[in-house]
């Protein structure tokens, strides 16, 4: 049965339709891009973006600052979801278990506040998501006593983390393009199935910077490494361009669902064939809906909202109308979306419990991390 995907509600339908068209352009084969005045104008804009990016990168070299701590950056080359947040969680737990005093630094996209600060790990989540950003609020909820700090300028929030929490290792969430801060380890994530899209930089393509800039990375992590053929093809492409660059493959494993954010665990087997409505306001909502269908959930309707979208009263009404119209048992959303929801809605949704899994690459990845961080051990209390 084909899932009916609704592109948001009200004015957000136009935004999501435009977003879907842009993604089709970005991930089409380069040779299929037809000429014309509009495409020529977009190409010119893409060239201008690239020139501006290079200018900013060169300028940043002269004002880069170093924190008195080991700095690990988790970033990507393309816009959209590649799984930075699950890897950030994995790294924070790994380094903490190894005896490091870890702090996570996030920009706090879309937050209402402006001053750098620590994200509380408890409180009304929808309020915290508004003040600090949805991803930092989710990170703080998941990491508990591992501090998460937000701030536009990572050096300022990093100093705050070091002085307030005595952090000796900081993780930059989405840090590859943050040139103002020196880092000791740059990890870049790529989608194993289609790492570069059409190969162009914004706005003609999905790349934040050219492929050649992967030379700055210390290692590459291929996410969504599900199809062996895609992984092998992407590995071969990277090995040819960057022969000495370590490449690790990982995929996101669904451990189960929670009845409400942080609620009781619902086994996967109990979700099979149950009628459901889903919604997501993330960069690539279709991948989330496809995951649910792959689990054989009877997904009858799905709502795709703009990235970081905070549901309105109209959205909530549309969701409950869909549940009634489809005779659905379940209302499913992502963890990032759940932290933005008002309390009553957050308690009734089903939220997937996703983890990053390196499979056979895990031992090699752990050894790589240990080797890179050796000699920069935790400072004594």
Swiss-Prot record:
It is an enzyme of class 2 (transferase). ATP binds at residues 78-85. GO terms for molecular function: ATP binding; tetraacyldisaccharide 4'-kinase activity. It catalyses: a lipid A disaccharide + ATP = a lipid IVA + ADP + H(+). One of its GO terms (biological process) is lipopolysaccharide core region biosynthetic process. Pathway: Glycolipid biosynthesis; lipid IV(A) biosynthesis; lipid IV(A) from (3R)-3-hydroxytetradecanoyl-[acyl-carrier-protein] and UDP-N-acetyl-alpha-D-glucosamine: step 6/6. Transmembrane segments: none annotated. The keyword Lipoprotein does not apply. Transfers the gamma-phosphate of ATP to the 4'-position of a tetraacyldisaccharide 1-phosphate intermediate (termed DS-1-P) to form tetraacyldisaccharide 1,4'-bis-phosphate (lipid IVA). Belongs to the LpxK family. This is Tetraacyldisaccharide 4'-kinase. The lineage of its organism: Bacteria, Pseudomonadati, Thermodesulfobacteriota, Syntrophobacteria, Syntrophobacterales.
């Amino acid at each position: 049965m084909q899932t009916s995907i609704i592109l948001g509600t009200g004015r957000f339908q136009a935004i999501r339709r435009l977003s879907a068209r842009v993604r089709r352009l970005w991930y089409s084969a380069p040779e299929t891009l037809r000429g014309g005045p509009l495409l020529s104008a977009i190409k010119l804009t893409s060239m201008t973006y690239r020139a501006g990016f290079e200018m900013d990168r060169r300028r940043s070299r002269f004002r880069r600052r170093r924190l008195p701590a080991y700095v690990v950056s988790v970033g990507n080359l393309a816009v959209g979801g590649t799984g930075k947040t699950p890897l950030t969680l994995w790294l924070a737990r790994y380094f903490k278990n190894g005896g490091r005093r870890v702090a996570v630094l996030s920009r706090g996209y879309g937050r209402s506040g402006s001053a750098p600060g620590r994200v509380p790990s408890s409180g009304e989540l929808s309020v915290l998501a508004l003040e600090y950003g949805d991803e930092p609020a989710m990170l703080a909820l998941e990491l508990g006593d591992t501090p998460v700090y937000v701030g536009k300028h990572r050096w300022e929030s990093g100093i705050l983390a070091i002085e307030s929490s005595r952090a000796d290792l900081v993780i930059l969430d989405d840090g590859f393009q943050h040139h103002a801060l020196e880092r000791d380890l740059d990890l870049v994530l790529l989608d194993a199935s289609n790492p570069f899209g059409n190969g162009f930089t914004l706005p003609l393509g999905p790349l934040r910077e050219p492929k050649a800039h992967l030379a700055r990375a210390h290692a590459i992590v291929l996410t969504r490494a599900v199809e062996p053929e895609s992984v092998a093809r992407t590995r071969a492409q990277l090995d040819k361009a960057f022969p000495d660059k370590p490449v690790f493959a990982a995929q996101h494993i669904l451990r189960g669902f929670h009845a409400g954010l942080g609620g009781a665990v619902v086994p996967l087997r109990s979700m099979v064939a149950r009628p459901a409505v889903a919604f997501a306001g993330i960069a690539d909502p279709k991948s989330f809906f496809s995951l649910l269908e792959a689990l054989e959930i009877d997904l009858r309707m799905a709502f795709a909202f703009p990235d970081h979208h905070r549901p309105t009263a109209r959205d909530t009404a549309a969701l409950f109308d869909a549940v009634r119209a489809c005779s659905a048992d379940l209302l499913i959303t992502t963890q990032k979306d759940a932290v933005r929801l008002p309390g009553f809605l957050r308690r009734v949704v089903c939220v997937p419990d996703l983890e990053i899994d390196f499979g056979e690459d895990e031992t090699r990845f752990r050894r790589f991390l240990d080797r890179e961080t050796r000699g920069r051990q935790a400072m004594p209390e």
